[in-house]
Amino acid sequence: MSYITPTKRIFTPEDLSKWVGSPTYNTVLDFIVELQSSVTGKSNDSSYETSSIIDKLSKLLSKVDNLITLHPAHDSVSRFGKIEFRDFYSDLSSKAEEYISEITATAIQETSAYFIESWGNSTRIDYGSGHELNFICFLLCLKELGQITSADYEGLVLKVFTQYMSIMRKLQKEYWLEPAGSHGVWGLDDYHFLPFLFGAAQLSTHPHMKPKSIHNDELVEMYSTKYMYFECINFINKIKTIPNHQGKLSLRWHSPMLDDISAAKNWDKIREGMVKMYKVEVLGKLPIMQHFMFGSLLKCPEGIPEHTDENGHGENPEDHCGHAHVNTWGDCCGIKIPSGIAASESLKHERKGNIPFD
């Protein structure tokens, strides 16, 4: 089998319609759902079947973590992303194939492309659910290569994905990464989706913890290291508001969607709902999927053309942050806004009051 460098192929609503429900779409979705199912009732510290691939992936992520220390961010009065992230990203990009070669001897360039895209965009200094999806695609490529089996799924989520999340939180805090295409208060999290999807499965069989438990700050903080859902809530609580003598603002104020979801009857309903929401808000959204890459392992659906310009050349997706636009304004990328982390840290520095940032 010959391997190729993945490229972006989804540029129009027509392309997107061919993607949704395609064999590759189903492969990606099925993999995510299988990963979710594997951690049903499992906490982050639950035992799982160890394997060489889990160990190799963990070592790979540790190398990424170590790169952050080589490129410390400098103090800045700006509330936007810190440019030192570009140095980190460049260093990672140059080393990615070397790192991946320790995991697989085939399709190194192809799998590396997804791995590199897992850490954000160096031009915009941002990160979002599309980058998170690339990390899943990186793992899926290894599955397609036979490096990963279903026996590894628990370890992939409980060890590898949680380690990836930990590094991403570090990157978000260190470089003040901006949220890519954030829905603001009407989203789950400025950056992530999958920890909610996996986390709901973790809690779906819990005998005592209810969805409304996310409003108990002490409980959330206590269990934030054990359950991904609570880690996300704890993270949001810490960055969305700055406590003062009046106390901090409620989840209802800065994250109304999460507040609404907490009214669900049980975690199993949330588990099911997260999959449905992921299909619509991530896999079914053009602003996200126009960044998705297809190669020999994750094949482009039939009927999606190779888009060319009037001279017959392939479209240059780098005209705007690595993708083409369906309109002339480029507002699919969202308005450039500071991250909640940047706003929160700036306010702490300025010793100001209790102000929410979305």
Swiss-Prot record:
UniProt GO BP: mitotic spindle organization; response to osmotic stress
KW Cytoplasm (keyword) present: yes
Keyword annotations of the record: Cytoplasm, Isomerase, Rotamase
Name of the protein in question: Serine/threonine-protein phosphatase 2A activator 2
Compartment annotation: Cytoplasm
One Gene Ontology cellular component: cytoplasm
EC number: 5.2.1.8
Major enzyme class: isomerase
